[in-house]
């Protein structure tokens, strides 16, 4: 049904629209000025006052509004009832309570925060803020007060009607606002639908008639032959006239083309129907024409010479592009070009006509434009084809992605995304610079080096899926050839796509497994896989290159060997531990010549030797298997080290101890001396049963070795060959019926004594620990290097038994009941031997330091030595006692106790308080014995002297000891008030070019003694007679220097002498200073 302008239907529609617009305008005026914006925008759809083409009839029809009818309708109907609101109503008491609580909180918060304001802020600002708060709170209470007063003035207290009225206003206002904003949104969304020049007449024609009324000039195009027939009062164009015009156009086009420069790609053309047809194979066919010779060529039609599937792909692009064209050409856009490929012909026509009109070489410029357009379109068609393959095709499982760059006119494709072998496949599609054609390039170095394997493809638009299949097939061939070159796989003669890998089923048999490559995903998979093969298939697919894949397959082979050995040992009663994982692999005989060990995943290790090539480094793998029997000691295992290569597999057997500490497995002991190496093919059930019966004795021997290692005692087990060939001393191996019942271990003396070197010069460096299982005895054999004082003294408390066949050899013996506590017996042996070590060392040191005829050992016990070394000390049987304090493991302390009658007893506090080596103590006692002997003589002489004449003058002598290096003798006369101090120091003196320790004797603090002092003559006499060491000017035979002091030298204000000279020099000084002052003055 169609309506015309000015019809009754059109006027009725306009009247209804006018009434609605007036009602909408009245409502918007009640809502305020803020809602007028959207209402004004609705006038954009009305008739334009400035449009000159708007007719008076149209304006009259648009302005007809029956206002009276609308007013009568509104007054006749009663107003509707207001909807009653019963929700969100709060009582007045609750409102007052909430407002009061809010006010108190605001005041309290202000008082708290006002204290922390800035100090330099004036008080007026604080008062103003407080006043503003008070006014705000007062306003809230006033609003509530006004509301209460107002409600009381309403009749019948029906103030709820006001609430319902307010709710109705808000709802109505919201509806109007929603309508206004919806109209505004419609205007904004219809921006592209507006004409540049508003033509309301034509718009109304299209709206009412469906098409504009264009002039036809009384002609109607038709193919009817009778030109005289009239159709709707219009004459038809004669057919003859049409044919003649076409012939004239053919001639005109021929002449015009003959005068133009035709590029080589456009040489294929023909002229018919008044047009010239240029055809470029596999690209396009364009039709051009002209009006006369003076007019340029113009566009008529264009066809793209692609296949049907590609054309259907491009149709989506051209349809989307055609929507952006001019509105007046929408009807033409829907037409087809004859090959079911919709194009944006109006846009192309405009561009092509502009090129033909403005270009100096129009046909060349036209070809360049269309050629680039076709290449771009073909590239986009390839992009659409990839989208189709990735979304719904065979590559829909995320095995292929591509990146389309329209600016660079390239497509980058990556396939085999889930596979990592030889990185991800890469393909680049773009325009080749030399040929300016669309090509596909396969970026693969191996394919570039290979012969008869293409990497560049042309004509890709119609065959993109086939090209991808060929590239993936060739890529799989390259990977297979690289793997076959490593001599790990074998090629299947029946199926060239299959790789065969040999896996052991038993120790002596192998079976092949088949490995293939999925051409779509690029992943490896096994045919008829087991759970183990499925697990390794995922590892193989994570391999970065052929080297890593070959190593993973070697790990698969090693795991299969482990499974075979584990099954064999478990079937014969052994238990295999699968939870033990050590940090470092067992160092085998394969990797003892400077090889490196590289840890891999799942506790596997790649072992690289110096003799292996780089390609074989990662193909030599090691795995350690820990097995044991149920009755074995705890933590002891038989360790099988399986070393697998491409062609063979060897197994090394060792005994070790593995302990779990803090959740980590630690290898505490490992036997590397008796390693058994066998090939995998030689392991049988019979040999495993024999191993069960012969390995227990080795376990016990290694337990003893481990106990010694825990004590950090270096040891070496003596093999049965050494015992049988009698390479050991005869007294060690005698007394045993068979060598199977004894174990002999060589121990190092220094490590047995925890690093002490005290007996290196006394005992032999090696000892022998002999365990007799039949008699349950353990002995420790040792031997003196030379005849010492200890050999002459038999000490029963040390439990030392000397060997009759060897006078210098002895042994310590204990009986045991449990080999698990053998450490306790070794501790006892160590304690006794340490006592012997210290005792022997002390005796040897005493004989060395006290080399005199007066030295004599009085008593010798395990923990005590008493000896005499002074010449004239006969008051006691001993001069010194050495006590050795021990604990359960070692020597705790060694103390030196001087006897009370010993002149050196004065230094006992220094020996007790200072921790000095007993070697130093012995040397010190010997060096200072003559000094203290002289001091004892001086003290005894002064203490036993009595003055019978009753003289009041007597000299007192005191001995002082500051430390072990400085002594003093004080001569003091209380009657005369004189005090003379002699200092004796131990000093290192350079004498005859070498350092030597001597006694330095000199006066101390002589500044207070003047020439008038009574003590000055005695000091002067000592300086001239003793310190000067010059007796010529003294002239008296008593002052001649003693012969024992011939080595004394002058040193500063005193004299330095040896221990042998200290006594005569001190006695000479004492003879001078012991005289009373009154006797010396007289």
UniProtKB/Swiss-Prot annotation:
Residues 13-28 have a biased composition (Basic and acidic residues). Keywords: Acetylation, Activator, Nucleus, Phosphoprotein, Transcription, Transcription regulation. It is found in: Nucleus. Residues 29-59 have a biased composition (Polar residues). Residues 1-80, 319-343 are annotated as: Disordered. Component of the Mediator complex, which is composed of at least 21 subunits that form three structurally distinct submodules. The Mediator head module contains MED6, MED8, MED11, SRB4/MED17, SRB5/MED18, ROX3/MED19, SRB2/MED20 and SRB6/MED22, the middle module contains MED1, MED4, NUT1/MED5, MED7, CSE2/MED9, NUT2/MED10, SRB7/MED21 and SOH1/MED31, and the tail module contains MED2, PGD1/MED3, RGR1/MED14, GAL11/MED15 and SIN4/MED16. The head and the middle modules interact directly with RNA polymerase II, whereas the elongated tail module interacts with gene-specific regulatory proteins. Component of the Mediator complex, a coactivator involved in the regulated transcription of nearly all RNA polymerase II-dependent genes. Mediator functions as a bridge to convey information from gene-specific regulatory proteins to the basal RNA polymerase II transcription machinery. The Mediator complex, having a compact conformation in its free form, is recruited to promoters by direct interactions with regulatory proteins and serves for the assembly of a functional preinitiation complex with RNA polymerase II and the general transcription factors. This is Mediator of RNA polymerase II transcription subunit 14. The lineage of its organism: Eukaryota, Fungi, Dikarya, Ascomycota, Saccharomycotina.
């Amino acid at each position: 049904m169609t309506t015309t302008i000015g019809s009754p239907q059109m006027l009725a529609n306009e009247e209804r629209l006018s009434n609605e617009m007036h009602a909408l305008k009245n409502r918007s005026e009640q809502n305020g000025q803020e809602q007028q914006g959207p209402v004004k925008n609705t006038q954009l759809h009305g008739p334009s006052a400035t449009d000159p083409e708007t007719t008076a009839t149209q304006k009259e029809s648009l302005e007809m509004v029956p206002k009276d009818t609308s007013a009568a309708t509104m007054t006749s109907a009663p107003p509707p009832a207001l909807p009653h609101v019963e929700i969100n109503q709060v009582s007045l008491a609750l409102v007052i309570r909430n407002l009061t609580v809010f006010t108190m909180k605001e005041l309290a918060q202000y008082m708290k925060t006002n204290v922390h304001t800035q100090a330099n802020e004036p008080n007026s600002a604080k008062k103003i803020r407080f006043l503003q708060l008070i006014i705000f709170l007062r306003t809230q209470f006033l609003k509530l007060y006004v509301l209460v007063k107002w409600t009381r003035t309403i009749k019948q207290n029906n103030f709820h009607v006001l609430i319902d009225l307010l709710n109705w206003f808000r709802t109505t206002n919201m509806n109007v606002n929603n309508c206004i904003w919806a109209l505004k949104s419609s205007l904004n969304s219809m921006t592209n639908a507006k004409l540049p020049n508003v033509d309301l007449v034509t718009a109304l024609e299209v709206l009412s008639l469906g098409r504009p009324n264009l002039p036809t000039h009384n002609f109607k195009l038709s193919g009817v032959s009778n030109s005289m027939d009239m159709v709707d009062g219009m004459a038809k164009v004669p057919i003859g006239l049409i044919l003649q015009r076409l012939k004239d156009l053919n001639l005109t086009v021929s002449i015009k083309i003959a005068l133009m420069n035709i590029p080589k790609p456009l040489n294929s053309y023909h002229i018919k129907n008044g047009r010239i047809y240029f055809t470029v194979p596999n690209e396009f066919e364009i039709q051009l024409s002209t009006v006369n010779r003076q007019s340029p060529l113009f566009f008529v039609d264009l066809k793209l010479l692609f296949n049907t599937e590609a054309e259907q792909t491009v149709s989506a692009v051209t349809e989307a592009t055609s929507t952006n064209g001019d509105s007046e050409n929408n009807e033409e856009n829907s037409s087809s070009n004859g090959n079911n490929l919709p194009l944006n012909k109006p846009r192309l026509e405009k561009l092509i006509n502009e090129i033909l009109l403005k270009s100096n070489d129009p046909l060349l410029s036209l070809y360049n434009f269309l050629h680039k357009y076709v290449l771009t379109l073909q590239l986009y068609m390839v992009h659409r084809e990839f989208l189709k393959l990735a979304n719904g095709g065979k590559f829909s499982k995320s095995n292929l992605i591509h990146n389309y760059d329209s600016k660079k006119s390239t497509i980058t494709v990556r396939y085999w995304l889930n596979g990592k072998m030889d990185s991800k496949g890469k393909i680049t599609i773009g325009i080749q610079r030399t040929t300016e054609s669309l090509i596909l390039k396969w970026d693969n170095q191996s394919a570039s080096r290979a012969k008869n394997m293409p990497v560049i493809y042309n004509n890709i638009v119609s065959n993109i899926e086939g090209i991808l299949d060929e590239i993936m097939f060739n890529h799989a061939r390259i990977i297979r050839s690289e793997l076959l070159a490593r001599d790990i796989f074998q090629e299947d003669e029946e199926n060239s796509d299959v790789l065969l890998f040999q896996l052991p089923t038993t120790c002596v048999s192998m079976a092949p497994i088949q490995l293939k490559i999925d051409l779509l995903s690029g992943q490896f998979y096994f045919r008829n896989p087991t759970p183990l093969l499925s697990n390794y298939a995922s590892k193989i697919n994570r391999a970065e290159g052929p080297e890593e894949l070959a190593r993973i397959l070697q790990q698969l082979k090693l795991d299969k060997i482990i499974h075979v050995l584990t099954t064999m040992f478990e079937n014969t009663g052994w238990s295999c531990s699968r939870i033990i994982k050590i940090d470092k692999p067992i160092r085998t005989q394969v990797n003892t010549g400077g090889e490196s060990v590289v840890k891999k995943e799942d506790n596997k290790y790649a072992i690289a030797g110096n003799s292996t090539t780089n390609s074989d480094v990662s193909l030599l793998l090691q795995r350690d298997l820990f097995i044991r029997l149920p009755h074995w000691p705890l933590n002891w295992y038989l360790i099988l080290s399986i070393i697998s290569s491409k062609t063979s597999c060897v197994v090394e057997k060792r005994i070790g101890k593995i302990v779990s500490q803090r959740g980590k497995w630690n290898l505490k002991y490992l036997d590397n001396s008796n390693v058994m190496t066998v090939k995998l093919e030689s392991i049988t059930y019979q040999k495993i049963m024999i191993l069960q019966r012969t390995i227990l004795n080795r376990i016990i021997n290694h337990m003893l070795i481990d106990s010694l290692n825990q004590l950090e005692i270096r040891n070496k087990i003596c093999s049965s060959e050494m015992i049988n060939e009698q390479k050991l001393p005869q007294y060690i191996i005698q007394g045993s019926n068979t060598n199977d019942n004894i174990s002999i271990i060589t121990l190092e003396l220094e490590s047995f004594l925890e690093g002490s070197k005290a007996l290196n010069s006394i005992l032999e460096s090696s000892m022998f620990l002999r365990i007799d299982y039949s008699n349950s005895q353990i002995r420790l054999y040792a031997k003196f290097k030379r005849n010492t004082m200890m050999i002459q003294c038999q000490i029963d408390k040390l439990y030392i038994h000397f060997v009759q066949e060897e006078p210098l050899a002895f042994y310590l013996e204990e009986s045991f009941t449990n080999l698990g506590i053998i450490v306790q017996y070794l501790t006892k042996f160590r304690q006794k031997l340490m006592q012997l070590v210290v005792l022997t060392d002390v005796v040897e040191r005493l004989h060395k330091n006290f080399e005199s005829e007066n030295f004599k050992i009085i008593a010798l016990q395990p923990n005590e030595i008493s000896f005499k070394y002074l010449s004239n000390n006969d008051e006691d049987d001993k001069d010194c006692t050495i006590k050795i304090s021990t604990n359960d493991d070692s020597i705790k302390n060694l103390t030196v106790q001087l006897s009370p009658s010993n002149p050196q007893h004065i230094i006992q506090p220094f020996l007790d308080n200072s921790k000095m080596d007993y070697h130093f103590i012995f040397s010190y006692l010997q060096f200072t014995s003559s000094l203290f002997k002289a001091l004892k003589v001086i003290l005894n002489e002064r203490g036993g002297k009595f003055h019978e004449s009753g003289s009041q003058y007597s000299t007192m002598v005191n001995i002082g000891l500051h430390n072990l290096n400085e002594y003093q003798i004080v001569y003091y006369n209380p009657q005369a008030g004189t005090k003379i101090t002699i200092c004796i120091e131990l000093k290192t003196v350079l004498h005859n070019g070498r350092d030597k320790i001597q006694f330095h004797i000199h006066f101390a603090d002589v500044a207070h003694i003047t020439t008038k002092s009574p003590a000055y003559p005695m000091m002067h006499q000592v300086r001239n007679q003793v310190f000067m060491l010059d007796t010529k000017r003294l002239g008296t035979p008593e002052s001649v220097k003693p012969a024992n002091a011939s080595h004394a030298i002058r040193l500063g204000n005193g004299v330095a002498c040896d221990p042998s000279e200290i006594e005569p020099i001190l006695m000479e000084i004492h003879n001078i200073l012991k005289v009373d002052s009154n006797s010396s003055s007289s």
